[in-house]
Amino acid sequence: YQRXSRYYYYXGPPDDIDDRY
């Protein structure tokens, strides 16, 4: 998890593929 992805912060399902990892 890099650059503060949603999954990293919210711990929820990755909504943005570009922001997933």
From Swiss-Prot:
<protein>
    <recommendedName>
        <fullName>Conchiolin protein p20</fullName>
    </recommendedName>
</protein>
<dbReference type="GO" id="GO:0005576">
    <property type="term" value="C:extracellular region"/>
</dbReference>
<comment type="similarity">
    <text>Belongs to the N16 matrix protein family.</text>
</comment>
<keyword id="KW-0582">Pharmaceutical</keyword>
<keyword id="KW-0964">Secreted</keyword>
<keyword id="KW-0272">Extracellular matrix</keyword>
<keyword id="KW-1015">Disulfide bond</keyword>
<feature type="compositionally biased region" description="Low complexity">
    <location>
        <begin position="1"/>
        <end position="14"/>
    </location>
</feature>
<feature type="region of interest" description="Disordered">
    <location>
        <begin position="1"/>
        <end position="21"/>
    </location>
</feature>
<comment type="function">
    <text>May be specifically involved in the formation of the nacreous layer.</text>
</comment>
<comment type="subunit">
    <text>Homooligomer; disulfide-linked. May also be disulfide-linked to insoluble organic matrix.</text>
</comment>
